[in-house]
Amino acid sequence: MTKEKIGVVLLNMGGPDSLDAIQPFLYNLFSDHDIIQIPKPIQKPVAFLISRLRAKKTKKYYEIMGGKSPQKEQTLQQAQKLQEKLEEDYKVVVAMRYWHPFTEEALNQLFQEKIKKIILLPLYPQYSRTTTGSSFNEFDRRVKRYINPGKFAVLSTLKGTKDPYYYFSNIPIAKINCYFDNPLYIKAMVENIKENLPEDYKDYYFLFTAHSLPEKIILDGDPYKKQTETTVKLIMEHFPNVKYSLAYQSKVGPVKWLEPFTDQEIERLIKEGYKKLIVIPVSFVSEHSETLYELDYLYGNIAKELGAESYIRIPTLKSHPMFIETLKELVIKNS
């Protein structure tokens, strides 16, 4: 008899896996109404235009990074490590929001098993409607396509399945919103930071950096900013007497975004005499353009030009054992 399993879906943004994938990736990103809230009738035409305009410039970033984002490989490795921890009672799959493997690919994998429950586990420690919320919405949309027979062709790979629609119309789905203050997650962050610090780290200034958001989203009630600040505060309880601040990166467009911006904060700190910086990505758990290009290349060069004596960027968690343990605990608590 086939054993029933709990499906675990790791949700992440995704990134282009080749230079040719950059424009369609950007198109998918700017087509997301949870991020860019413009009238829906013009959303896709605007997304097509923006993606074409930005693709050439973005391609240069990815050429510096080796021609692709490493996020897919790192997320799949996180899934593999988590699968090993959970063993055969669970089936762990990956659903990216803007590039392969997409949500429907994750659903196809789950269809091959006898699933009794699904747990959605975002790889975004802090909740935002633009990240976790968007991934939840996309998952809900794709599930509805599966349980509407005859309207969509996505079930063609399931030929011979006795009753494919039974699955997602009857299975309970648990959604983990966030874990920004989870003790194991904080422990993972602290361990990862300590493992990459120089001996004289107390002579450094800790600069935490997170993905920025339009200020209006926060004013409308999104908890992302407050949760990110809480994460930083909990981490810094383990580093007494070290000076620190939080900044935001990756602003796009003319509207007002969360500040201070990371590059401007670097400039301010160096001008004020803090010439030894430890830069800590706090909202990312894998490497991508915002860490490898912005933090390492762009901001690293800015710091050097401004006279920084040392600029150390802490790696993201990736498959850090304590982070995988965090994910395991979250899954078990929601099983």
UniProtKB/Swiss-Prot annotation:
Pathway in which this enzyme or protein is active: Porphyrin-containing compound metabolism; protoheme biosynthesis; protoheme from protoporphyrin-IX: step 1/1
Primary enzyme class: lyase
Cited InterPro entries: Ferrochelatase, Ferrochelatase_AS, Ferrochelatase_C, Ferrochelatase_N
EC number of this enzyme: 4.98.1.1
Compartments in which it is found: Cytoplasm
GO cellular component: cytoplasm
GO biological process, one term: heme biosynthetic process
Keywords, comma-separated and alphabetical: Cytoplasm, Heme biosynthesis, Iron, Lyase, Metal-binding, Porphyrin biosynthesis
Superkingdom of this protein's organism: Bacteria
GO molecular function, one term: ferrochelatase activity
Pfam families (UniProt xref): Ferrochelatase (PF00762)
Protein residues bound to Fe cation: H211, E290
Catalytic activity: heme b + 2 H(+) = protoporphyrin IX + Fe(2+)
Family: Belongs to the ferrochelatase family.
Protein task: Catalyzes the ferrous insertion into protoporphyrin IX.
Protein name: Ferrochelatase
Species this protein is from: Sulfurihydrogenibium sp. (strain YO3AOP1)
Gene name, Swiss-Prot/TrEMBL: hemH
